[in-house]
Protein backbone atom coordinates (compact mmCIF):
# COMPACT_ATOMS: atom_id res chain seq x y z
CA UNK A 1 0.00 0.00 0.00
CA UNK A 2 1.30 3.46 -0.89
CA UNK A 3 2.15 5.65 2.07
CA UNK A 4 -0.16 8.65 2.42
CA UNK A 5 0.99 12.02 1.23
CA UNK A 6 1.95 14.24 4.17
CA UNK A 7 0.72 17.81 3.87
CA UNK A 8 1.73 20.66 6.14
CA UNK A 9 1.25 23.64 3.82
CA UNK A 10 -2.48 24.44 3.40
CA UNK A 11 -1.86 25.48 -0.22
CA UNK A 12 -1.07 21.84 -1.06
CA UNK A 13 -4.66 20.91 -0.19
CA UNK A 14 -5.94 22.55 -3.37
CA UNK A 15 -5.19 19.41 -5.40
CA UNK A 16 -7.45 17.38 -3.09
CA UNK A 17 -10.42 19.76 -2.95
CA UNK A 18 -13.69 17.86 -3.21
CA UNK A 19 -12.37 14.83 -1.35
CA UNK A 20 -13.71 13.15 1.77
CA UNK A 21 -12.33 14.57 5.02
CA UNK A 22 -11.75 12.90 8.39
CA UNK A 23 -10.66 15.40 11.08
CA UNK A 24 -8.97 13.87 14.14
CA UNK A 25 -6.81 14.85 17.09
CA UNK A 26 -4.56 11.86 16.48
CA UNK A 27 -3.76 8.95 18.80
CA UNK A 28 -5.74 6.91 16.28
CA UNK A 29 -7.63 3.78 17.29
CA UNK A 30 -10.04 1.45 15.49
CA UNK A 31 -12.86 3.96 15.89
CA UNK A 32 -10.91 6.55 13.91
CA UNK A 33 -9.83 3.96 11.37
CA UNK A 34 -13.45 2.95 10.78
CA UNK A 35 -14.17 6.59 9.87
CA UNK A 36 -11.27 6.61 7.41
CA UNK A 37 -12.50 3.35 5.86
CA UNK A 38 -15.98 4.87 5.52
CA UNK A 39 -14.45 7.88 3.77
CA UNK A 40 -12.50 5.59 1.43
CA UNK A 41 -15.73 3.88 0.39
CA UNK A 42 -16.87 7.19 -1.11
CA UNK A 43 -14.39 6.72 -3.93
CA UNK A 44 -13.09 10.27 -3.48
CA UNK A 45 -9.60 11.16 -2.25
CA UNK A 46 -9.42 10.81 1.54
CA UNK A 47 -7.77 13.48 3.66
CA UNK A 48 -7.20 12.81 7.37
CA UNK A 49 -6.12 15.69 9.57
CA UNK A 50 -4.25 15.36 12.85
CA UNK A 51 -4.36 18.40 15.10
CA UNK A 52 -4.69 18.60 18.89
CA UNK A 53 -6.93 21.64 19.14
CA UNK A 54 -6.10 24.01 22.01
CA UNK A 55 -9.34 26.00 21.77
CA UNK A 56 -11.50 23.10 22.98
CA UNK A 57 -9.48 22.43 26.14
CA UNK A 58 -10.08 24.29 29.41
CA UNK A 59 -6.98 25.34 31.41
CA UNK A 60 -7.40 22.39 33.80
CA UNK A 61 -7.78 19.77 31.04
CA UNK A 62 -5.23 17.49 29.41
CA UNK A 63 -4.03 19.46 26.36
CA UNK A 64 -0.32 19.06 27.15
CA UNK A 65 -0.70 15.40 28.13
CA UNK A 66 -2.85 14.43 25.15
CA UNK A 67 -1.02 11.63 23.26
CA UNK A 68 0.68 12.60 20.00
CA UNK A 69 2.13 9.47 18.29
CA UNK A 70 2.24 11.17 14.88
CA UNK A 71 4.43 8.69 12.96
CA UNK A 72 2.27 5.78 14.10
CA UNK A 73 -0.89 7.69 13.21
CA UNK A 74 0.33 8.45 9.69
CA UNK A 75 1.03 4.75 9.10
CA UNK A 76 -2.36 3.67 10.45
CA UNK A 77 -4.23 6.31 8.47
CA UNK A 78 -2.56 5.17 5.25
CA UNK A 79 -3.33 1.52 5.94
CA UNK A 80 -6.99 2.42 6.51
CA UNK A 81 -7.22 4.18 3.14
CA UNK A 82 -6.20 7.79 3.67
CA UNK A 83 -4.57 9.30 0.59
CA UNK A 84 -3.20 12.27 2.49
CA UNK A 85 -2.56 13.20 6.10
CA UNK A 86 -2.81 16.90 6.84
CA UNK A 87 -0.70 18.10 9.77
CA UNK A 88 -1.63 21.77 10.14
CA UNK A 89 0.47 24.02 12.31
CA UNK A 90 -1.26 25.94 15.04
CA UNK A 91 -0.31 29.19 13.32
CA UNK A 92 -1.91 28.12 10.03
CA UNK A 93 -5.25 27.51 11.74
CA UNK A 94 -5.01 30.29 14.32
CA UNK A 95 -2.94 33.13 12.84
CA UNK A 96 -4.34 35.44 15.53
CA UNK A 97 -2.46 33.45 18.19
CA UNK A 98 -3.61 30.95 20.79
CA UNK A 99 -5.02 33.31 23.40
CA UNK A 100 -6.92 35.36 20.84
CA UNK A 101 -8.29 32.20 19.21
CA UNK A 102 -9.47 30.88 22.58
CA UNK A 103 -11.24 34.18 23.21
CA UNK A 104 -12.75 34.05 19.71
CA UNK A 105 -14.01 30.49 20.25
CA UNK A 106 -15.63 31.55 23.52
CA UNK A 107 -17.48 34.38 21.77
CA UNK A 108 -18.75 32.43 18.76
CA UNK A 109 -22.50 32.02 18.28
CA UNK A 110 -22.93 28.26 18.41
CA UNK A 111 -25.87 26.08 17.32
CA UNK A 112 -28.72 25.73 19.79
CA UNK A 113 -28.10 21.99 20.09
CA UNK A 114 -24.79 22.87 21.79
CA UNK A 115 -26.66 24.66 24.55
CA UNK A 116 -29.12 21.95 25.54
CA UNK A 117 -29.58 21.98 29.32
CA UNK A 118 -27.83 19.27 31.34
CA UNK A 119 -25.57 18.18 28.49
CA UNK A 120 -21.90 18.72 27.61
CA UNK A 121 -22.02 22.51 27.51
CA UNK A 122 -23.15 22.71 31.13
CA UNK A 123 -19.84 21.33 32.41
CA UNK A 124 -17.58 22.43 29.54
CA UNK A 125 -18.92 25.79 28.31
CA UNK A 126 -15.74 26.38 26.28
CA UNK A 127 -15.89 23.10 24.38
CA UNK A 128 -18.29 23.52 21.47
CA UNK A 129 -17.04 27.00 20.60
CA UNK A 130 -13.56 25.51 20.21
CA UNK A 131 -14.87 22.59 18.18
CA UNK A 132 -16.88 24.84 15.85
CA UNK A 133 -13.92 27.16 15.32
CA UNK A 134 -11.41 24.45 14.45
CA UNK A 135 -13.83 22.47 12.26
CA UNK A 136 -14.82 25.61 10.36
CA UNK A 137 -11.22 26.54 9.69
CA UNK A 138 -10.30 23.02 8.64
CA UNK A 139 -13.27 22.87 6.27
CA UNK A 140 -12.23 26.21 4.77
CA UNK A 141 -8.73 24.87 4.12
CA UNK A 142 -9.59 21.34 2.96
CA UNK A 143 -12.77 22.23 0.98
CA UNK A 144 -14.14 18.67 0.98
CA UNK A 145 -17.33 17.38 -0.57
CA UNK A 146 -17.98 15.32 2.57
CA UNK A 147 -16.63 14.94 6.10
CA UNK A 148 -16.95 11.98 8.46
CA UNK A 149 -17.59 12.37 12.20
CA UNK A 150 -18.14 9.65 14.80
CA UNK A 151 -21.43 9.00 16.56
CA UNK A 152 -19.56 8.40 19.82
CA UNK A 153 -19.64 12.16 20.40
CA UNK A 154 -23.34 12.39 19.56
CA UNK A 155 -24.00 15.96 20.66
CA UNK A 156 -20.84 17.11 18.89
CA UNK A 157 -22.03 15.42 15.68
CA UNK A 158 -25.35 17.30 15.89
CA UNK A 159 -23.54 20.59 16.56
CA UNK A 160 -21.34 20.12 13.48
CA UNK A 161 -24.32 19.14 11.33
CA UNK A 162 -26.14 22.29 12.42
CA UNK A 163 -23.09 24.50 11.86
CA UNK A 164 -22.46 23.13 8.36
CA UNK A 165 -26.12 23.41 7.38
CA UNK A 166 -26.39 27.03 8.55
CA UNK A 167 -23.12 28.43 7.16
CA UNK A 168 -23.08 29.52 3.52
CA UNK A 169 -19.37 28.69 3.29
CA UNK A 170 -20.11 25.00 3.76
CA UNK A 171 -23.18 24.47 1.61
CA UNK A 172 -22.86 21.22 -0.30
CA UNK A 173 -20.64 19.51 2.28
CA UNK A 174 -22.18 16.21 3.40
CA UNK A 175 -21.68 15.28 7.06
CA UNK A 176 -21.38 11.48 7.23
CA UNK A 177 -21.90 9.79 10.63
CA UNK A 178 -19.66 6.89 11.65
CA UNK A 179 -20.95 4.22 14.07
CA UNK A 180 -19.42 3.77 17.53
CA UNK A 181 -16.69 1.15 17.76
CA UNK A 182 -16.35 -0.53 21.14
CA UNK A 183 -13.69 -2.45 23.02
CA UNK A 184 -14.38 -6.09 23.89
CA UNK A 185 -15.70 -5.06 27.31
CA UNK A 186 -18.14 -2.57 25.79
CA UNK A 187 -16.25 0.65 26.46
CA UNK A 188 -16.40 3.00 23.47
CA UNK A 189 -12.98 3.33 21.87
CA UNK A 190 -11.29 6.59 22.78
CA UNK A 191 -7.75 7.95 22.65
CA UNK A 192 -8.04 8.58 26.39
CA UNK A 193 -8.87 4.97 27.30
CA UNK A 194 -5.17 4.19 27.68
CA UNK A 195 -5.04 6.57 30.64
CA UNK A 196 -7.71 4.66 32.60
CA UNK A 197 -6.01 2.71 35.42
CA UNK A 198 -6.66 -1.03 35.16
CA UNK A 199 -8.44 -1.07 38.54
CA UNK A 200 -10.95 1.49 37.22
CA UNK A 201 -11.64 -0.17 33.89
CA UNK A 202 -14.68 -2.11 35.13
CA UNK A 203 -16.11 1.08 36.60
CA UNK A 204 -15.64 2.88 33.27
CA UNK A 205 -17.69 0.19 31.56
CA UNK A 206 -20.63 1.48 33.56
CA UNK A 207 -21.14 3.99 30.74
CA UNK A 208 -21.94 1.25 28.23
CA UNK A 209 -23.89 -0.74 30.83
CA UNK A 210 -26.05 2.30 31.60
CA UNK A 211 -26.95 2.71 27.94
CA UNK A 212 -27.73 -0.99 27.60
CA UNK A 213 -29.99 -0.83 30.64
CA UNK A 214 -31.79 2.26 29.32
CA UNK A 215 -32.57 0.56 26.02
CA UNK A 216 -35.31 -1.57 27.55
CA UNK A 217 -36.94 1.28 29.50
CA UNK A 218 -40.51 2.16 28.55
CA UNK A 219 -40.26 5.96 28.93
CA UNK A 220 -37.50 8.59 28.76
CA UNK A 221 -37.91 9.21 32.49
CA UNK A 222 -37.46 5.50 33.22
CA UNK A 223 -34.41 5.40 30.95
CA UNK A 224 -32.79 8.33 32.74
CA UNK A 225 -33.54 6.77 36.12
CA UNK A 226 -32.00 3.41 35.21
CA UNK A 227 -28.96 5.13 33.72
CA UNK A 228 -28.37 7.08 36.92
CA UNK A 229 -28.81 3.95 39.02
CA UNK A 230 -26.35 2.00 36.86
CA UNK A 231 -23.75 4.77 36.90
CA UNK A 232 -24.01 5.08 40.68
CA UNK A 233 -23.63 1.30 41.03
CA UNK A 234 -20.35 1.58 39.11
CA UNK A 235 -19.21 4.39 41.44
CA UNK A 236 -19.00 6.89 38.60
CA UNK A 237 -19.23 10.64 39.21
CA UNK A 238 -22.18 11.57 37.02
CA UNK A 239 -22.26 14.85 35.07
CA UNK A 240 -25.41 14.07 33.10
CA UNK A 241 -27.57 11.15 32.00
CA UNK A 242 -30.21 12.57 29.71
CA UNK A 243 -32.45 11.23 26.93
Language model: regions and residue ranges:
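Nucleotidyltransferase catalytic core that binds NTPs
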Residues: 2-237
Amino acid sequence: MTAPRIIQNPAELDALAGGCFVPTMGALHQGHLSLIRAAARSGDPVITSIFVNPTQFAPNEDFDAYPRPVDRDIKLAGEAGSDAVYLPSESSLYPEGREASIDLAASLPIPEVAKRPQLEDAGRPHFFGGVCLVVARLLEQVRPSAAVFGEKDWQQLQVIRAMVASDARFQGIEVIPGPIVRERDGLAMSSRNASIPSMHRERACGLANALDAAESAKTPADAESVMRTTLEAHQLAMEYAVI
